[in-house]
Design a protein with these regions (language model features):
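Polar/acidic, low-complexity leader/linker segments enriched in S/T/G and N/D
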Residues: 1-40
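Short, solvent-exposed beta-alpha or beta-beta edge segments that form flexible loop/patches at the rim
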Residues: 24-61, 110
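Oligomerization/assembly interface segments of phage tail-like spikes and tubes
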Residues: 45-70, 119-133, 255
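Short beta-strand and beta-hairpin "edge-sheet" elements
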Residues: 89-133
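Intrinsically disordered, low-complexity segments enriched in serine, threonine, and glycine
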Residues: 135-275
């Protein structure tokens, strides 16, 4: 028998419960978001593209074989509890795609269709996932202390995490398409293009009203539970001026990086992705 495939969801490994998967439902692609508009007197329809993609339901046909009814029921119950206890988007990986991961939510219950109730059960694990397949390599930081370049190996512009130490101008891309200026910074500011926020490293907190906030950090999908009455100061956005009010992205191919000498360190976690 060949190697049995399994998944890992927020640290929960299906194989620890005797559960293994097949890959029929993991290779589909998400739909592009937009609106089809019919124009009188014109053949066909006009597609108003929004430039983004919809969420996708990822389904894993799964099975469990234990040999004993009591053990079977226990394992299913434990797996159901482990998956259902995770809230919000969590990291989802599987052995079919060892070089990438998704962000998914386990929202649906786990219904077992017993093939032989005392020995095995077949069922489907469903996750509501963001459209991107994030590359593991996109988590590796690229560090600059002077001008340089970065190469996006995919066909899609990424929304990076950028950590800036110092003050001055940073320009990414040809002709500095994605440019911003940092002022009054006395340490390191994190700029998160995915959630369009800027803040200090975790732990440096200031007054806020929400109980918690989800922040995509280097390990995309980590949920930072903030204490009641805390926040990042002004979200730090007031310290940064973005050219044309656009958060930085890294477009496909080699992209130049330019920065002022007063920027002492620039760390980019690129978050490469594909569909």
């Amino acid at each position: 028998m060949g190697l049995l495939n399994h998944l890992i969801y927020d640290g929960v490994e299906s194989r620890d419960f005797g559960v293994f998967i097949s890959g029929e439902g993991v290779f589909d692609a998400p739909a592009r978001r937009g609106e089809m508009i019919s124009i009188p007197g014109r053949n066909g329809s006009l597609f108003m593209d929004e430039g983004v993609f919809e969420n996708i339901t990822v389904e894993y046909p799964a099975f469990i074989g234990t040999g004993y009814e009591e053990l079977f029921r226990t394992k299913i119950g434990d797996l159901r509890s482990a998956l259902s206890s995770r809230g919000n988007y969590k990291r989802l990986t599987d052995t079919y795609h060892p070089d990438e991961f998704r962000l998914g939510v386990f929202r649906e219950g786990l219904e077992v269709d017993p093939q032989h109730i005392t020995r095995a059960g077949g069922f489907t694990l469903k996750f509501d996932c963001k459209p991107q397949r994030f590359l593991i390599s996109g988590e590796d930081p690229v560090i600059f202390t002077a001008n340089g370049s970065i190469t996006n190996p995919t066909l899609f512009a990424s929304s990076p995490m950028i950590k800036v130490t110092g003050n001055g101008t940073v320009a990414i891309g040809d002709d500095g398409k994605y440019r911003f200026v940092v002022s009054n910074n006395t340490g390191t500011i994190w700029i998160d293009s995915e959630i369009m926020e800027a803040y200090l490293p975790a732990g440096e907190l200031y007054p806020w009203t929400d109980e918690s906030e989800t922040v995509l950090t280097q390990e995309i999908g980590i949920e930072l539970e903030l204490l009641d009455g805390t926040q990042y100061p002004e979200n730090m956005l007031s310290y940064i001026e973005f050219y044309n009010s656009i958060m930085p992205k890294i477009e496909p191919g080699e992209q130049p990086i330019r920065m002022s000498p007063t920027i002492t360190r620039l760390e980019i976690i690129p978050r490469w992705w594909r569909l």
